[in-house]
Amino acid sequence: FDEHNRLHCLTDRAGFWQPWAESGEGLMPAPSAHADHAPAPWQLGASTWLPMGEQAYLASWTEAGFGHLGIRTADGTIDDFTGEYSRFRSLALDDEFIYCIAASPVYPSAVVRISRTDHRVDVLAGGVAPLPPEHISRPQTLCYPSGGGQAHGFFYPSMQGEIKPPVVVFIHGGPTSACYPMLD
């Protein structure tokens, strides 16, 4: 609920988990990317978006496997706070900062504080990489035919030049989980 006691929720009525809000005409979609704005809804306790009044909201969403973070206003413009991160969870905010658990392909999960004015990121806890970032392979999105549709994944190219490293494949047991482009 927002400060005007209007209900805000996520629904997949349009094919993606997207924000909707109560209005005089019933439940209406909020302006949003054609992308999922939440992980599987049976993973309870997630905070992936927050209403900010007058149809503005803070949200994380996933496009081509990579997470994004931004404030979307009623006119549809987005103030993008994604930076170098690719996964955002447990969103909170105040007048000055956005707080969340964020991770990237080269840094593990960290509690971060992001300035709403200059987008400066402060790591409050965690996020210590076990290797220098230049030694960590970065994921590339990958789509390939599977059954009657498309499967999606990430390819991590070798950081060793011509030396072929072993192939590591992560398969999730969906639909309850997914793979994310983050160091874990």
Regions from the language model: what does each represent?
Residues F1-D2, T11-D12, E22-S47, R72-R89, ...:
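Multi-bladed beta-propeller domains
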Residues E3-H4, D12-G15, G24, E54, ...:
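Short strand-connecting beta-turns/loops that link adjacent beta-strands
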Residues H4, R89-F97, I101-D184:
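Serine-hydrolase catalytic core recognition
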Residues H8-A21, S32-Q43, S60-H68, E84-Y85, ...:
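A flexible loop/linker signature enriched in serine peptidases of the S9 family
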Residues P19, M28-S32, W49, H68, ...:
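Secondary-structure boundary/capping motif
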Residues P19-A21, L27, W49, H68-I71, ...:
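Hydrophobic beta-strand positions in blades of beta-propellers and related beta-sheet-rich domains
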